[in-house]
Amino acid sequence: MKTLLLTLLVVTIVCLDLGYTLKCNKLVPLFYKTCPAGKNLCYKMFMVSNLTVPVKRGCIDVCPKNSALVKYVCCNTDRCN
């Protein structure tokens, strides 16, 4: 019985992510990275002159303010950027 409980515990630990980790797209959305602790937002950065093509994507802790030249879009779910 103890062996069964130990086996179930190990399987649970392996299958579950004990600390939620966010995954954000890199510049090319086919690739993503797992965000380090404390970086709980994904972001996309655009040049205001061309809002259709993002110039940077990744993980961030606080969404930056937009400026006259750069626009940021932030979100908090896996690969949302």
From Swiss-Prot:
List GO BP terms, alphabetically: killing of cells of another organism
Please list the tissues where expression of this protein has been recorded.
Expressed by the venom gland.
The protein's UniProt keywords, in alphabetical order, are: Cardiotoxin, Cytolysis, Disulfide bond, Membrane, Secreted, Signal, Target cell membrane, Target membrane, Toxin
Chief localization class?
secreted
Does the entry annotate any disulfide bonds, and if so which pairs? 24-42, 35-59, 63-74, 75-80
| Pfam families hit by this protein | Toxin_cobra-type
Q: Which GO terms describe its cellular component?
A: extracellular region; membrane; other organism cell membrane
| Top-level taxon in the UniProt lineage | Eukaryota
Q: Which residues form the signal peptide?
A: 1-21
Q: Which molecular-function annotation in GO is an example for this chain?
A: toxin activity
Q: Where in the cell is it found?
A: Secreted; Target cell membrane
Record's subunit section: Monomer in solution; Homodimer and oligomer in the presence of negatively charged lipids forming a pore with a size ranging between 20 and 30 Angstroms.
* Entry function: Shows cytolytic activity on many different cells by forming pore in lipid membranes. In vivo, increases heart rate or kills the animal by cardiac arrest. In addition, it binds to heparin with high affinity, interacts with Kv channel-interacting protein 1 (KCNIP1) in a calcium-independent manner, and binds to integrin alpha-V/beta-3 (ITGAV/ITGB3) with moderate affinity.
Family, similarity comment: Belongs to the three-finger toxin family. Short-chain subfamily. Type IA cytotoxin sub-subfamily.
Instruction: Tell me what this protein is called.
Output: Cytotoxin 5b
Instruction: Provide the species name.
Output: Naja sputatrix (Malayan spitting cobra)
The organism's lineage is: Eukaryota, Metazoa, Chordata, Craniata, Vertebrata
